[in-house]
Structures are given as structure tokens and as C-alpha cells.
Regions:
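Specific transmembrane alpha-helical segments of multi-pass solute transporters/efflux pumps
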Residues: 72-116, 120, 157, 238-256
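Hydrophobic/small/kink-forming positions within alpha-helical transmembrane segments
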Residues: 29, 33, 61, 93-98, ...
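Transmembrane alpha-helices of multi-pass small-molecule transport proteins
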Residues: 41-96, 126-130, 181-185, 202-220, ...
Length: 307
């Protein structure tokens, strides 16, 4: 089996970056409503945290296996964890899979797909703060801070929908905490990809993180008693979302500046809102004036940060 050579200049082409990043955002945006649909197909209640964690673990173990297969086809050989990257895989597994999705799955079960998709967009702002003030990987300018404030205003506004001035810690609060974990994982993935295969890192961290989540969910009493063909297909789709999107995003980050790729992140809430409105029938909230203004503010904030 021959290795598929990835040309750095080809990966840096505007059309390739545009199409690749848009595909990632479309897949990630579809995850918001599809996870909620998956809960219904597997008969997982919104209060059944243990079953939600078990469901997440199963998804990511499968996603990791798919990513390793994908990476092996690209390399023309079976990809194994490279020497000296065990601790790096562990760090990514804890941040990108265990901590991020522990909060994400719990939060999504207690809020709407529309709200979740917009709040998740804040990870762009958090990543800039983390990379600038903690890891000193880039300068945090006044323009970037302005973008952060504009985007945060959008998050605050969406939580005022219907004159509701309160945020649920188990809902919107959990989704926000998941974005913080994702921001840290993005910084580490960019750093580690300089020396290691990003697809290999994504695949094995998914497997490790998925096993941890599965074990935790099972130990907490989580069980998935309702099995159907539709439920299995949805689980496979969600696994493909993670395997394809994270692997492709990691490759784009490897060959391009973070800002050039991150600017496309504004499409995550756009796709999330549209698909949630369509698949979850949240049209009243998704198409309401408050949600639309909130979405515009978040997208404007990301644009200001990256222009």
C-alpha cells in the first residue's frame, strides 16, 4: 500500500482551505441536532447523565478507530503512536474528548441545539486568550479584544431570549465550560502537530478518551438498553463527524496559520442554527429576532478577530 503524499502548497491553497474548513464546520454544526436525535433513538433521557457519558464514549472509541484507519490509508501503513507522544495523546484525550465532551453532552441535554451552537462559537475567543496570555503564541491586540467583546455580547443576548436573564449551570454553563477545554486542546494540537501526525494524534486521543468516558458512564450506572438500526446508524454518523472533521482540521492547522483556518469557525453556529431549526423543529427560536441578532454578533466578533 503506497503512501499518499500531502503537498504542503496544495493544502495552503485558498480553495482547499475554504472547502476543507467549510466541510469541517458543516459536520460540526450537524452534531448539535444529531446528538439530541441520537438521545431519542437510544431512549436516553435528558437527566440520565451516565447514559449520555456512555453514549459519548462509544462514539469516540469508534471515531478513533475510523481516524486511525483513515490515517493508515494516507500513510500507506498502519499508524501507531509515535515515540515520545504518549503523554501528548493523554493530554489531548483529557482536554479534547473527556473534559470537553463530558460538559458538552451534559449541557446539550439541558439546552436547545440553537443555544448550544452559538455558545460553542466562543471557543474561538477563548483560544485567542489562552494562546496569547498563557502560551504567548500570538499577540492579543485591541482589535482581537474588541472581537471577543462583540462575540460575548452575542452569547449574553441569546440567553436573554424570552426575557430570561438566567443561565443554567447544567445547560448553557456546561456548554461554555466545554469550549474552554476545547480552546486548550486546540493550542496543544497545533503545538504537537509540528512534530507528530495530526491524524494519528486525533485518532488515538479519541480512543483513549472514549474508553475513559465509556468506563465512567458504565460505572455510574449508564446503560443503553434500546438498540435500533436507526440508532446505530446515527452513532456511526456522529463517529464519522469526529473522525473526519478533527483529522481534516488538524491537517489544515498543520499547514496554515491558525488565524487563516479559525476564521471559518464562524460557520459552526450558522450551520448549527440552520440544522437545529430544520431537524429539531426549533424554528421559532432559530428564526426569532433575538437569536438572529445574537448569531450576527458572534459571527461579527469572529470576523473582527481574524480580519
Amino acid at each position: 500500500m503506497n503512501k499518499i503524499e500531502i503537498n504542503a502548497k496544495w493544502m495552503q491553497k485558498t480553495s482547499v482551505v475554504w472547502l476543507g474548513a467549510m466541510l469541517c464546520c458543516l459536520l460540526w454544526g450537524s452534531a448539535f441536532p444529531c446528538i439530541k436525535i441520537g438521545y431519542g433513538l437510544w431512549n436516553i433521557e435528558s437527566a440520565d447523565t451516565s447514559a449520555q457519558i456512555l453514549f459519548a464514549g462509544m462514539r469516540f472509541v469508534l471515531a478513533g478507530i475510523l481516524a486511525v484507519i483513515f490515517g493508515s490509508l494516507l500513510e500507506g501503513r498502519f499508524i501507531r503512536p509515535e515515540k515520545g507522544c504518549a503523554s501528548k495523546i493523554a493530554w489531548l484525550a483529557m482536554l479534547q474528548t473527556v473534559i470537553q465532551y463530558l460538559f458538552f453532552y451534559i449541557g446539550l441535554a439541558n439546552t436547545s441545539g440553537v443555544k448550544a451552537s452559538i455558545i460553542e462559537a466562543v471557543n474561538v475567543f477563548v483560544a485567542i486568550i489562552v494562546s496569547g496570555f498563557i502560551f504567548h503564541q500570538e499577540n492579543v491586540t485591541a482589535k482581537k479584544m474588541l472581537g471577543c467583546l462583540v462575540g460575548f455580547a452575542g452569547v449574553v443576548l441569546i440567553n436573554m431570549n424570552g426575557m430570561n436573564f438566567q443561565m443554567s449551570l447544567s445547560g448553557e454553563g456546561a456548554i461554555f465550560l466545554s469550549t474552554v477545554a476545547y480552546a486548550f486542546s486546540s493550542v496543544f494540537l497545533k503545538r504537537y502537530s509540528a512534530k507528530h501526525n495530526p491524524v494519528m494524534l486525533s485518532g488515538y486521543q479519541f480512543i483513549v478518551g472514549g474508553i475513559i468516558l465509556s468506563a465512567a458512564g458504565f460505572a455510574m450506572g449508564g446503560r443503553l438498553s434500546t438498540v435500533s438500526a436507526e440508532g446505530v446508524l446515527m452513532l456511526i454518523y456522529l463517529a464519522l463527524v469526529s473522525a473526519v472533521a478533527y483529522s481534516l482540521w488538524g491537517m489544515l492547522l498543520k499547514y496554515n496559520p491558525i488565524s487563516r483556518v479559525a476564521v471559518f469557525g464562524f460557520m459552526n453556529p450558522v450551520f448549527g442554527v440552520i440544522l437545529s431549526a430544520w431537524l429539531l423543529r426549533e424554528g421559532a427560536q432559530a428564526l426569532g429576532p433575538v437569536s438572529l441578532v445574537s448569531l450576527v454578533l458572534v459571527c461579527a466578533g469572529i470576523y473582527i478577530v481574524n480580519k
